[in-house]
């Protein structure tokens, strides 16, 4: 029996080692079982190419509903081109296509069809579903800016395809002599100029025997063109059983002519060929990180998270006839040369999504960084939340982190002068229409060293803490660029502004009034108010650049550890009076049974790694494995809160590898503990890094010892430049904590206070 089990185990390892198809472990439905009241990811199946301009998804929600696909739904209303980064931000430039039989129904309720997940195939590059109501199988395989649909119809004299250009301003034209439909949608949720349009072209391979257009719900047969609030079209034909009708679709934010250029991405490929190319594109990026020695659920969770990390920010540029990048500017409405990416919120993604790109996909991030320079040139500000232009959401000036971390890690924009100019501009201005862009409250902050609690600027303590870290990032770049000493010293001083909010009595961060007094009354369990989607227990740790300074404020490492431990020990009680209701982030904290630790939202996601700064890395190792095991799974309810455009997924990717970028802008990754027995990172420079932990297991999650390229290694961090050199990190795991490793002062990671 033992020999049999060993043989099965060995064979399974061989199968995994040979299967270089990493997409087989990706579940695009992970996190899709979400609602307004409780998020388990708030994702949808994004059928796309990595960072593709357009995603496609089956649509179960009503037109305009941010929850466009939910796993618990049982009807599909259409197949939608989407650019939605989050249900809270919603979509723009969306339109849909839907096969129907029997009657030419345009109404989304009447055309909807029952479906079952057993009849659904979802991969990153291909989607297939059986629509029971119409007896039609729908398949789709996208490129970056185009898609091929294949509809397999039953025998019917009345088979149709509905094209819905959505409401709030749209245009449609049926061109029967060319088997073509063209149109545009202007639908958006904000952040666009007045001339915004998404132009689309749809080409069919079967002549139409029926044609109609729709204006605001009114079906008009043999009318071929509509410009109205809500336009649509229906074309039809006779089909025999099993007949396949194809629809080739391309779109452009620039023009119909550019959409025609984008259609060339499909070439003459059939759907199998496009799916194969999509699979290859995904395997190329997923395969940059190979993990071995885990169980099937761990593989699925890891690669599903890596897939989510490689979707946003998406390309918002197109290629002209000469193959050069060109973009419609969502900031000034002009068509301009160069790169543009969008659909990301830096409040979320500065933390580890962009550091992951810097480490593993720097050439793509180089394009993103150039796009940020273009954003500043076109709007006067770097974005903080872009979808597709500036959106009023969240706090902080974290574009500084995204730009500086990239530059310091060798992902350098061509125009560093404009980069630095834009960073300085952002510290002294706020966007006149979008107050979350730039720095709201900057005059108070620059004068007092904090944004006051009592001057009617919401979430003021959160702003202060993030501005201080952002100033440290600018300080880092100013030093690198050898800026005048006075300038460097200014940002060094402002980087310490976090201290202005520390309350010695509670040993927590607390809102502070303009006259210098602290807010009163003060409840550390109160969500919102002075903080953003969290409370003081969550935000106190937002001193990414200076944990030692925070340790000193709390009275030393012992008290710091006690306060950290308390986050898990304090019951999941809360004060929701600021919101007047239990917001979903609160509920996600309470249901996870981990005290007041709220991993479902970003402010606290780095906190566990701070144990390393206080000389108790084994506590980080314990809690990290707890979070990975209890709060992630490759299932529709697989996240413990909003996935947030790759951030919560990238946290898992880094943590499963055994390190994490607590402070973007430094060259350090803080060591946790690997999840897999082996991981291999293939860098763009041609080097590979192997992380080998052969005795890793469910019970052996503590790091007993570590060596790097054969040399004993006790530090609690790894350096970026050393990782890129490749080599081997050997980790001996244990079921007992080693309380002697990583405890010496020289083992501690970077803190700004130590440099002063």
Residue ranges and their predicted role:
Residues 470:
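ATP-dependent phospho-/nucleotidyl transfer catalytic cores
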Residues 20-354, 358-401, 407-465, 473, ...:
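Accessory carbohydrate-recognition regions in carbohydrate-active enzymes
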Residues 1-20:
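Bacterial Sec-dependent N-terminal signal peptides
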Residues 702:
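Extracellular attachment/recognition segments
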